[in-house]
Amino acid sequence: LEFLIKRIYIFPTLIMKKIVAYIVLIFFITIYLISSHIGYMKKVTEWKYKSKTIFASDKYSYGDLYGMSYYPIKEVFGSDSLTVPIDKYPNTKNKNLCLVHDSYLGGAFLKQKYQLSGIDTIFDIEYPWRNKPSTPILLDTTKINILVFEIVERHLLTLFDSLTATNVVKFKINIPNAINKRQIIQDEITTASNNSPIEKIVQILFCENVNTNLEFVIFNSRIFTPFKEFKSYINNTFFDRKATDIFVSANKKYMFYSETRTSIEKKITNAEVNKTVKLLNYVYEYYKKKGFSEVYFSIIPNPVSIIEPDCENYNNLIPLIQNNKNLIVPMIDIYTVFKKTNNNIYYHSDTHWNKNGFQLWLNEFNRKTNE
């Protein structure tokens, strides 16, 4: 009888253990499948960055450099106030703007369209390394057509070349003889959707990004942020170890992306400067022949070039190019403006400029295009 009683008590316990084990197994299988599926990961990512729950992500709430390091320098991204004046110019709407840009411009720039003097239509084009297709443009000969190339300093010598520059702007008149980027992407999507069920299963089971995705789904949540900050604090305080992709300013108030330092410390030869000037001139003349009324370039300084140029042995890349006697390209010179201002123009925990830096660029854009 005693044996039967024990069995009666043990049996439900075993059942509960199995139920819990199956629940845990199903949970982790579900997480794995979600992390292996592009469509599901896109939805999860969108939810994590929009949600305010403890399971959502705050990785970029304080800037991209904070999200890379969790170093205890953080500033609520976008919370800064504008302290520079907004220059006013007549808005005649007689210009069309084709803007080729990286992450410094784009969405935020387009939202400020009402500040752009004389601009009617904006063609928004991102560089190929941004992995976003652009729509072919059609120049309106009844208006002034302006082309602006904006590029951050660290990318000028490494990613910008004649092939990239002369192919980044697509014209509608070339569509019959060329391939539209959007069509390429659509074809890839169609091809992927036509894969056999077995091929789809293999793609999910052996997804090359699954480890990164799993880490994002499980650990990229607000609930883990205090632990990440504590780990970063311990590593920095007691072991003098920081994330390899960032370094901290001498006054401990700013974080910088490591690539911004290496790009300005590299010694620049006269041959490299002349080669870059020749490239900019070539691109300028190429697009003038394509029908643009004017072509401008704007090199955005790395934050460290403005904030700590002496500490990091700045190679003066921007002034060497902009002051070169052979340069024929009109420049939207934000470097000189930034060097003169007393305003804070960069975020403390992000690679980008803040509202002041952005507004100063808008002011200089309007001034230059209204000369």
Regions found by a protein language model. Name each.
Residues 1-371:
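Extracellular glycan-modifying ectodomains
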